């Protein structure tokens, strides 16, 4: 990608975030084009893509035959097919898996590093973009296309926008916003995704979890009414037989070091500590607070105390902006 990522600043929680323009270099874009695109994706991901309109984007999982996620994808219609955004660390293996049956279909599946991914969030983000685009996405119309640019709208943790565009437009946006917006890299967007409870699947956790263990059903990412897709039997069993005992949680507090993706944490049990969970992502905010996204048992007590392994500091459960009730 020729567009240079912005230098990192310590991320800020959404409630205190000034207007910020971010380069999303830790995320990556991929596309499927061709006459069979919709049919092909319908057989590969958990969401019902046949029901998607041009004005929607949705979270979906791409699973293996056992229902474990290679990756989760932020999907939207693009040209005569679809595009999706996922963590850069999983794109190559995810595309390798997705292409396995493509030889029998009229599709072309490819990474897209020509386009640039930007995020805009923080104080009066909508007003800042309203001067630059003739229409902005909203709850009713979550995807808007203008020229070479696609804008995606997100409600949580506070209104924000993901921009998929060409290099020239990315440079124009940077020039226009440079004076009024802080510039940051993808760690800020990661912090917002953690706060929003959007699961972050990096390479360390690819192939480890069924979608429901990361709350995908609560985020509208699983259709239980659509036809067959890879891993469907296991995903359905988890719902209808109550086989899933895990959920994605948001923890906040202090830690002397950031836990890495794939690491476990420790849960306080009386005077002792017991290993628990799997970390998906963690970020240290500018106020010193550490936020951690972790998959753990879904019956944790709300007042449970956790820590990074052998650490002197503690973490506690924070509420997510959505309900886990089906």
UniProtKB/Swiss-Prot annotation:
GO terms for cellular component: cytoplasm. Keywords: Cytoplasm, Folate-binding, tRNA processing. The keyword Signal does not apply. It is found in: Cytoplasm. Folate binds at residues 27, 189. InterPro entries: GCV_T_N, GcvT/YgfZ_C, tRNA-modifying_YgfZ, YgfZ/GcvT, YgfZ/GcvT_CS, YgfZ_barrel. It holds the Pfam family GCV_T. The keyword tRNA processing applies. GO terms for molecular function: folic acid binding. One of its GO terms (biological process) is RNA modification. Belongs to the tRNA-modifying YgfZ family. HAMAP family: tRNA_modifying_YgfZ (MF_01175). PANTHER family: TRANSFERASE CAF17, MITOCHONDRIAL-RELATED. Folate-binding protein involved in regulating the level of ATP-DnaA and in the modification of some tRNAs. It is probably a key factor in regulatory networks that act via tRNA modification, such as initiation of chromosomal replication. This is tRNA-modifying protein YgfZ. It comes from Shigella boydii serotype 18 (strain CDC 3083-94 / BS512). The gene is ygfZ.
């Amino acid at each position: 990608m020729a567009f240079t990522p912005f230098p990192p600043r310590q991320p800020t929680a959404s409630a205190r975030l000034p207007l910020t323009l971010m380069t999303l270099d830790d995320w990556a874009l991929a596309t499927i084009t061709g006459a069979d695109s919709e049919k092909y994706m319908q057989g590969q991901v958990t969401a019902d893509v046949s029901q998607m309109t041009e004005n929607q984007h949705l979270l979906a999982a791409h699973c293996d035959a056992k229902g474990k996620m290679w990756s989760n994808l932020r999907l939207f219609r693009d040209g005569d097919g679809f595009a999706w955004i996922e963590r850069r660390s999983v794109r190559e293996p995810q595309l390798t898996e997705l292409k396995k049956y493509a030889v029998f279909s009229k599709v072309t599946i490819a990474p897209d590093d020509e386009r640039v991914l930007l995020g805009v969030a923080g104080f009066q983000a909508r007003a800042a973009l309203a001067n630059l685009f003739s229409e902005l996405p909203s709850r009713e119309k979550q995807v808007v296309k203008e020229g070479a640019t696609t804008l995606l709208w997100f409600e949580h943790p506070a209104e924000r926008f993901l921009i998929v565009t060409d290099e020239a437009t990315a440079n124009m946006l940077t020039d226009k916003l440079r004076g009024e917006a802080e510039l940051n890299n993808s760690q800020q967007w990661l912090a917002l995704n953690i706060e929003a409870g959007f699961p972050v699947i990096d390479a360390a956790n690819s192939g480890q979890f069924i979608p429901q263990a990361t709350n995908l059903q609560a985020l509208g990412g699983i259709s239980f009414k659509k036809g067959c897709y890879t891993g469907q039997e296991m995903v359905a069993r988890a719902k209808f037989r109550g086989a899933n005992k895990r959920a994605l949680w948001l923890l906040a507090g202090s830690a002397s070091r950031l836990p890495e993706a794939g690491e476990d944490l420790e849960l306080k049990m009386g005077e002792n500590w017991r290993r628990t969970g799997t970390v998906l992502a963690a970020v240290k905010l500018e106020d010193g607070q550490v936020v951690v996204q972790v998959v753990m048992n879904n019956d944790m007590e709300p007042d449970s105390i956790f820590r990074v392994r052998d650490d002197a500091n503690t973490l506690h459960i924070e509420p997510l902006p959505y309900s886990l009730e089906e």
